[in-house]
Curated annotation (Swiss-Prot):
Its EC number is 3.6.4.-. Its main location: cytoplasm. This is Actin, muscle. It is found in: Cytoplasm, Cytoskeleton. Actins are highly conserved proteins that are involved in various types of cell motility and are ubiquitously expressed in all eukaryotic cells. Belongs to the actin family. InterPro entries: Actin, Actin/actin-like_CS, Actin_CS, ATPase_NBD. It comes from the Eukaryota. Signal peptide: none annotated.
Length: 378
């Protein structure tokens, strides 16, 4: 590795299903955070000289959402549309970070238990389209643990497209005990759209979904006792909040505030037959060796945007205490910066001097092809 490659600051790009978090290794927060959205006009452009584009990315797509059809290139943590994904990366490098990707090594993240082809294609695009000097793909949950300063713990990482529980002991992930749940922020938003429709508020288009997402983020919370909370909501107006829509209309939101997030603990609300997040964490711990369980119970790390609901830590504590053996000490760790903890972990990892030997170099890629990513990235 030549000297000038050593000096270039590595980039860290956490491509979530909902948000792209990107920045430079060594920083304590991502420089650029924008929605992982590509929007295409759904109407004919008639005014000349407007500089209309055939596609908009991120915040610009968000601000023009009234005339666009919005698509998310990443679904359930898996890239489903590579052309759009390239647009998102291009936007990240050239417009947001304003750097040349051929000069900086790039650390990317991905969800555990993703199809192998996904990371191969990522590697291929980085080296062939963007000419990266070096790159690396890391599992999101492992980075979250780095960010919390632990080497042992079970991470519940719940973003927009996928939730997963990853038990890690002394720095080793236990692949047999990793569980994945395709229930996360986007499903909750869709569920809230349905619930609001039952109330007579019609939210249908891709642009209106973004309004519902905002309602969810601003007003949603997790009830400690769901039945009790439903009673409270039915008998008093203390839980009601009002929200102003972009056109000035004001709507009131009552029990929808906590019914939405409750689906994390009761996926049957969404018509899913899977276990809730608390049971998934428990099942994941039970798949581990009996000797490591105690340490996992005491280090439950929450991360990702969907764990930002107020009250989720207390509810998680209550549910875990009910599932675990009675003498077990349970601790839920919910760091305030957990929305970005995966990115922060990547920033820490990429700036370690010992990590320099881990990068996949362009020369190695040219020799072995995309499959090298399975050899070098754990």
């Amino acid at each position: 590795m030549s000297d000038e490659e050593e000096e270039a600051t590595p980039l860290v790009c956490d491509n979530g299903s909902g948000l792209v978090k990107a920045g430079f290794a060594g920083d304590d927060a991502p420089r650029a955070v924008f929605p992982s959205i590509v929007g295409r006009p759904r109407h004919q452009g008639v005014m000349v000289g407007m500089g209309q584009k055939d596609a908009y990315v991120g915040d610009e797509a968000q601000s023009k959402r009234g005339i666009l059809t919005l698509k998310y290139p990443v679904e359930h943590g898996i890239v489903t549309n590579w052309d759009d994904m390239e647009k998102v990366w291009h936007h990240t490098f050239y417009n947001e970070l304003r750097i040349a990707p051929e000069e900086n090594p790039c650390l990317l993240t991905e969800a555990p238990l993703n199809p192998k082809a996904n990371r191969e294609k990522m590697t291929q695009i980085m080296f062939e389209t963007f000419n990266s000097p070096a790159m690396y793909v890391c599992i999101q949950a492992v980075l979250c643990l780095y960010a919390s300063g632990r080497t042992t713990g079970i991470v519940l990482d719940s973003g927009d497209g996928v939730s997963h529980t990853v038990p890690i002991y002394e720095g080793y992930a236990m692949p047999h005990a990793i569980l994945r749940l395709d229930l996360a922020g986007r499903e909750l938003t869709n569920y809230l759209m349905r619930v609001m429709c039952d109330r007579g508020y019609a939210f249908v288009t891709t642009a209106e979904r973004e309004i519902v997402r905002d309602i969810k983020e601003k007003l949603g919370y997790v009830a400690l006792d769901f039945e009790q909370e439903m009673l409270t909501a039915a008998t008093s107006t203390s839980l009601e909040k009002s929200y102003e829509l972009p056109d000035g209309q004001v709507i009131t939101i009552g029990n929808e505030r906590f019914r939405c997030a409750e689906a994390l603990f009761q996926p049957s609300f969404l018509g899913m037959e899977s276990a809730g997040v608390h049971e998934t964490v428990y099942n994941s711990i039970m798949k581990c060796d009996i000797d490591v369980r105690k340490d996992l119970y005491a280090n439950n790390v929450l991360s990702g945007g969907t764990t930002m609901f107020p009250g989720i830590g207390d509810r998680m504590q209550k549910e875990m205490v009910a599932l675990a053996p009675s003498t077990m000490k349970i601790k839920i760790i919910a760091p305030p910066e957990r929305k970005y903890s995966c990115w922060i972990g990547g920033s820490i990892l990429a700036s370690l001097s010992t990590f320099a030997s881990m990068w996949i170099k362009k020369s190695e890629y040219d020799e072995a092809g995309p499959a090298i990513v399975h050899r070098k990235c754990f």
